[in-house]
């Protein structure tokens, strides 16, 4: 593997290409530059490069099929390249991109875009380089809910970003989030469920704990609690396919079936439950309804693969039709019924596979399709029969989605022994241990990162998942990653993050190159240098020195800083002293609990813009630990089925996952630029937050800092990008 040169002047290529050779010189886009294709079959992909360069850099490059006039040549090469691979050569005379297939050409285009530099004269340049590249894993995926209607454009930007880092699979959970012509009552019941869940004591989590067992999560964030038209969903699917994605609709079967059972209680395994999460697998009406829904989903997605769900089955063999059947019989019959339906339509099947598993986790407990029972605090009895023996009763060409890989390093070998291929679900690339060993399994095809939240940029980023998208994309693509490279990989993701944020938000930030008129410092002279290059700063007395503004809840006076300038943005370098507990959005967090205070931007005309400061979004604690740990923890890394009886602890092992020392790290890397500084001889972390001024034509007179919490907020620096 050629080591990349990662200095201030070299573009960051991420994921890291397999082979890179930097050369001297550069290619400059001029007035006569053209994009040419070897054959018209490559024309639609070449248009992608043309459109991206125009969108990102405002430069139009003509496209033609006359190879003799080429400056940028795009085509296919059938020999010498691996699947999805490409060869890219850049010299002073031009660029040549050849892909092993259409996907390879698309990924080569993403690398071209990462190489691009717009210089101070406005010319678009590309450093000379030779690259041979291909992915390590064939499945590099993401699991998302259908977005809310108001988030569709942002959802497309998210897809665009995932293509930029060479992800190739989107699993989109459909549920009640797409209109159904045959069954509009499903959409109506879905909207009602989502509204009722918000009003329920404890919200959706309250519903989950309302019965004798821990019910399936409701996924009420799907579709924003509503649904999209078929045309809107089709537009999203077509957009993703145009960027090279396999788009897999997830049509939940058996479990997580609220979208079906709330509209048709007659098919619920427990129709007396006010919120039934599981359908009856012995009722013929179940499949008539499911197949009607699936027909409409297939019509819109036109998929090669469909995910049928089946995770977290916790209500089985309870109703009169099912109670005399074994667990493996019920599970296998349901899987096979859905499998045969899709196979007849030429569609392959993916499923969450844990109910076909039987293993002991690192914490000594049995997991998967084992027998489960318990009595709740009200004395109610609940049981689920064992189902794991169904693994011998279902087709071997079902692709297993394995989210129990974080409980044991043997789950993939168990599936391999039974003849199944799989990929990891709920993957966190930055946290998995021994990826180099586990990824070498012959039956492991890759992984997907899950979101389980509103499909919008803010929520996904706050849950640290944008960071996980990037890190996971890197190690799924590159062949040589191992645990010793974690810190370097994190550093590359941090360096890439500003460009990713601009892509997702559709706007430029001054700190990442979007400012041409320089900066002006209003507090701490070297604020910008510290943020950009990590320059050391020393404060001998944090609370009393002239270099820091400390505003606290016990001070009577607000802190004012003179600006007296027209600015495009204001950049705050700040931090707090105490950490706050991280709660992910799927636990339905109240963000007002994280409100620390804010800034008032005062304009010359007397108007004021308020900037709220939320912990984990705009700033974090100074004593941030940017590391991870691996060891025995009292809690499993993720929510798993609650086991009793024979699930008593029998042995312990080191978890196959690391845990972050700082649970806010991914969020803060996205929303701010973390800055390491020396304060009183100790390394501390400050956070640069850039606020975009909605009224750049109005002069900013001053900035006033205000506290509203019991936290002490420290403002170390303030700068502005001049208009």
Language model segments and positions:
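Contiguous, structured surface segment used for ligand recognition
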Residues: 1-138, 146, 603
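Substrate-binding groove of N-acetylhexosamine-processing glycoside hydrolases
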Residues: 6-16, 20-22, 29, 43, ...
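An acidic- and aromatic-residue-enriched active-site/binding cleft used to recognize and process polar
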Residues: 147, 167, 174-177, 185, ...
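Charged, glycine/proline-rich intrinsically disordered loops and linkers
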Residues: 183-223, 362-389, 640-670
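Feature activates predominantly on carbohydrate-active enzymes
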Residues: 40, 79-345, 350
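N-terminal/edge-of-domain interface segments
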Residues: 501-723
């Amino acid at each position: 593997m050629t080591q990349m040169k990662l200095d201030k002047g070299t573009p960051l290529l991420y994921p890291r290409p397999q082979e890179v050779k930097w050369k001297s010189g550069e290619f400059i886009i001029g007035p006569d530059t053209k994009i040419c294709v070897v054959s018209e079959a490559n024309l639609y992909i070449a248009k992608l490069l043309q459109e991206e360069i125009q969108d990102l850099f405002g430069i139009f490059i003509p496209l033609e099929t006359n190879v003799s006039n080429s400056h940028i040549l795009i085509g296919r090469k059938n020999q010498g390249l691996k699947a999805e691979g490409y060869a890219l050569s850049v010299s002073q005379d031009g660029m040549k991109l050849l892909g092993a297939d259409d996907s390879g050409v698309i990924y080569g285009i993403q690398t071209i875009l990462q190489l691009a530099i717009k210089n101070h004269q406005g010319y678009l340049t590309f450093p000379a380089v030779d690259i041979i590249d291909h992915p390590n894993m064939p499945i590099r995926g993401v699991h998302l809910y259908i977005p809310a209607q108001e988030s569709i454009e942002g959802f497309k930007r998210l897809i665009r970003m995932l293509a930029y880092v060479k992800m190739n699979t989107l699993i989109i959970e459909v549920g009640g989030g797409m209109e159904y012509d045959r069954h509009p009552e499903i959409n109506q019941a879905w909207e009602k469920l989502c509204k009722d869940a918000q009003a329920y004591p404890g919200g959706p989590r309250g519903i989950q704990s309302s019965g004798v067992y821990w019910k399936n999560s409701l996924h009420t964030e799907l579709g924003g609690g509503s649904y999209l038209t078929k045309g809107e969903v089709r537009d999203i699917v077509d957009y993703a396919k145009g960027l090279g994605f396999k788009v897999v609709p997830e049509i939940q079967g058996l479990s997580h079936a609220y979208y079906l059972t709330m509209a048709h209680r007659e098919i619920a395994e427990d129709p007396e439950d006010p919120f039934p999460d599981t359908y009856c697998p012995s009722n013929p009406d179940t499949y008539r309804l499911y197949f009607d829904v699936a027909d409409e989903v297939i019509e819109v997605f036109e998929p090669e693969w469909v995910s049928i769900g089946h995770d977290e089955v916790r209500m089985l063999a309870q109703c009169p039709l099912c109670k005399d059947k074994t667990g493996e019989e019920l599970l296998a019959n349901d899987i096979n019924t859905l499998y045969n339906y899709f196979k007849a339509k030429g569609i392959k099947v993916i499923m969450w596979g844990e109910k076909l598993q039987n293993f002991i986790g690192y914490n000594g407990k049995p997991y998967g399709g084992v027998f489960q029972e318990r009595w709740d605090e009200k004395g109610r009895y609940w049981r689920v029969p064992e189902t794991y023996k169904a693994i011998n009763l279902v087709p071997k060409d079902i692709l297993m989605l394995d989210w129990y890989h974080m409980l044991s390093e043997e789950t993939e070998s168990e599936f391999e022994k039974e003849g199944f291929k799989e990929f990891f679900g709920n993957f966190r690339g930055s946290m998995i241990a021994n990826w180099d060993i586990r990824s070498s399994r012959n039956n492991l095809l890759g992984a997907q990162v899950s979101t389980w939240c509103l499909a919008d940029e803010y929520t996904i980023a706050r849950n640290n998942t944008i960071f996980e998208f990037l890190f996971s994309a890197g190690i799924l693509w590159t062949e040589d990653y191992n645990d010793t490279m974690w810190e370097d990989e994190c550093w590359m993701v941090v360096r890439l993050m500003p460009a990713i944020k601009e892509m997702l938000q559709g706007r430029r930030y001054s700190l990442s190159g979007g400012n041409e008129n320089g900066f002006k410092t209003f507090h701490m002279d070297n604020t910008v240098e510290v943020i950009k290059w990590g320059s050391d700063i020393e404060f001998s007395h944090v609370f009393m020195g002239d270099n820091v503004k400390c505003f606290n809840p016990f001070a009577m006076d607000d802190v004012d800083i003179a600006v007296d300038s027209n600015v495009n943005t204001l950049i705050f370098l700040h931090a707090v002293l105490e950490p706050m507990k991280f709660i992910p959005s799927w636990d339905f967090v109240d963000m007002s609990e994280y409100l620390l205070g804010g800034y008032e931007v005062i304009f010359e005309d007397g108007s004021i813009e308020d900037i709220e400061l939320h912990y984990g979004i705009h700033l974090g604690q100074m004593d941030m630990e940017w590391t991870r740990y691996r060891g025995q923890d009292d809690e499993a890394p993720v929510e798993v089925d609650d086991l009793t009886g024979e699930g008593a602890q029998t042995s312990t092992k080191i978890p196959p996952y690391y845990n972050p020392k700082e649970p806010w790290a991914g969020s803060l890397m996205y929303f701010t630029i973390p800055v390491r500084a020396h304060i009183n001889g100790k390394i501390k972390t400050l956070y640069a937050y850039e606020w975009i001024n909605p009224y750049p034509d109005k002069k900013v007179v001053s900035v006033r800092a205000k506290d509203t919490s019991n936290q002490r907020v420290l403002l170390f620096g303030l700068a502005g990008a001049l208009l």
